[in-house]
Amino acid sequence: MPAVDRFRQADRNPPSTQADGLKVTVLVLFVVVFLLPPALAATLHSRNRIVDWRNADRSSAGLLPPALPQTPAVVRIFSARTVRWRGIVATHSWIVLKSAGAANYSRFDYTAWGEPIWVDRFIPDGRWFGRMPELVFAADGTNAERMIPLIRQAVRDYAYPNTGDYRAWPGPNSNTFVAAIIAAVPGMRAALPPTAVGKDFPIDCRWVGLTPSGTGIRFNLGGYLGIAVGWVEGFEVNLLCAVAGVDIRRPAIKLPGLGRLGISSTPRS
């Protein structure tokens, strides 16, 4: 075949061929990133299912030292799988703090039961209805002491404090609450896990803004769709609250349902 004919044949339908190839690639990526991980998470959840969640273990997970007057200030963020089928893809987050000289911890949750902001209703590092909590953020000493009044003020100023404000999806829920506190406290460079459904709900209703850690920018459509790029958060894509992404700072991949796979993201301050 002459060279000219070969070029003519190659030029006949390249756009459609390339478009078809792109569609297949996008479809494969969608299945691998957004469908397979939740399916695997569902399988794992069924094997470790807690049947009677109302009577499930809520005892201390042993993640906090005893609260003694002589111990320094402490700030912690924990996250644990939620109850029933929602635990396949979602976690519940909360904040714990102790001032220097205090003999007890204070725990702040945001729930669907009654007035949503709950204080000291659960054991500070307790299992969440049988599910082991994960440490998300830790600060101690003078840095924690600096954060504590800012955290308390952020709780008082939270935009959704009333009965009926809670919405499991896309927010505001417990993860929205904790993300808002992170955003309100300078230096609290924490990133909630990708399974923290609701963390991307914009309480200020803005489409563009800083990430909660203040180290990046995010584009957000009501918590349903969005993209975030930040030094602490890494690169994240939010599709109907299913979050996938990568973390370069502490190498890991983030997948819906499965969560973060890689080096721990827990920073200490």
Where are these regions (language model features)?
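A structural motif
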Residues: 140-159
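Activation targets extended, charge/polar-rich intrinsically disordered C-terminal tails
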Residues: 11-60, 159-269
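Glycine-rich catalytic cores of cysteine/serine-nucleophile enzymes that process amide/ester linkages
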Residues: 46-142, 164-168, 243-257
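Extracytoplasmic/secreted proteins, especially bacterial periplasmic and envelope-associated proteins
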Residues: 92, 146, 150, 173-180
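N-terminal intrinsically disordered, acidic low-complexity segments at the extreme N-terminus
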Residues: 2-8
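Hydrophobic, Leu/Ile/Phe/Ala-enriched alpha-helical segments that form helix-helix packing faces
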Residues: 96-97, 155, 182-185
